Amino acid sequence: MPQERESRYVLPLEKALMAKGFGSISGGGSTLFDRAEPGEREILESCIDIELANLDEALDLTKQTLNELGAPVGSKLNYSKNDTACSEPIGDNELLNVYFDNYNLAPEIYEKVDTRTLYEALTTALKGKIVGTPNGPYTWPSEVLFYFIGPSADQIYEQIEPLRFEFPIFQNARVVFKKKDTQTAQTEIRIPFNARE
């Protein structure tokens, strides 16, 4: 998701820092993990490297800006102060990941719906709602991922869940909720094969 990281976080953050003379973006990258299917890899976390001229003020601006830009829960700000490694949690938005089955459904289902059509349907379902927007798709042989960032993963799912009655591609999809509530920080449901019933 490097392109989305660049447009959503990197460029606006660098603009805010440079406007105050507080620093600039010096790099970034992603850590990958091996998925269950052989040969498939997924992003575990993305990072942005920042050079700050004034740690205290620049740090406050960095936290404020990233939170305003919608940093998701689980994000961290790692830095060194007085030769001590520090880490602060940031981000108040929840995540909803929808992994569509890209292998086990009937061939005619894949023929009828492409990822562009699916993206447009997801966008329409959320239009005018302050709950989130779809990002993706990210495609592997086994699954296709669309992910959403917003104040409530539950509310996002409430808006897109009715689409399963219209699009059979929702059958057997995995839906992963990443929430602020530490008791239910990450939960997963599986939409049944008879998702249209």
Segments from the language model and where they lie:
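Acidic/negatively charged segments and metal-coordination signatures
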Residues: 8-15, 49, 55-57, 96-98, ...
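Short amphipathic alpha-helices in soluble, non-transmembrane regions
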Residues: 9-15, 58-69, 158-165
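Surface-exposed beta-loop interaction hotspot
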Residues: 66-120
